[in-house]
Regions:
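Elongated, amphipathic alpha-helical interaction scaffolds
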Residues: 2-169
């Protein structure tokens, strides 16, 4: 599972995900299977969560078998490499069944919601028990994001003042 603050612009994310699942499969040689026992390859998943997308979305990318000439069905597991791309829009989606996962992930990862709002969504909407260790982890996450936001504000203000002094404003 990998989270991205936004869809990368330097490369196509599907290409990176294909690279990851390929490495996960090839790294099984000698560990999950030996010699030519390719039927022992285990299924792998690469899950990507991209925040700040223009819309909430989810795509499942996998192999398919398509007969081009004839109807012969080749043997093998075409479900070995699995990629799931989850896009989270900047704003939390309304409570709607098709956006349940987006709402849960959005609540957990949101920099806009405070810790009590996150607990309300996680506990009340999703019936996830919020024991003290989970509360502490979510609280730490919220404090970390708040700290990063405050530090960025301070640095931005200092840079703005320095630039203003240089330009004689």
């Amino acid at each position: 599972i990998e989270a991205q603050k936004a869809e990368p612009s330097a490369y196509d994310i599907i290409n990176r995900a294909v690279f990851y699942v390929s490495r996960m499969i090839s790294s099984q040689k000698g560990r999950e299977f030996v010699n030519s026992n390719y039927n022992d390859i285990k299924r792998v998943y690469s899950i990507w969560i991209c925040m700040n997308m223009s819309q909430n979305c989810m795509n499942y990318i996998h192999f398919t078998q398509e007969s081009v000439v004839g109807t012969y069905q080749w043997k093998g597991d075409i479900d070995l490499a699995n990629i799931v791309l989850i896009g989270l829009a900047e704003d939390l989606p309304e409570k709607e069944e098709r956006y349940e996962l987006h709402r849960l992930l959005g609540a957990l990862l949101s920099a806009k919601l405070n810790v009590d709002e996150k607990f309300d969504i996680i506990g009340n909407e999703f019936d996830i028990p919020l024991e003290s260790d989970i509360r502490k982890d979510v609280n730490d996450m919220c404090n970390l994001s708040q700290g990063i936001k405050e530090q960025a504000y301070v640095e931005g203000t200092e840079n703005g003042i320095a630039i203003g002094k240089q330009e004689g404003i």
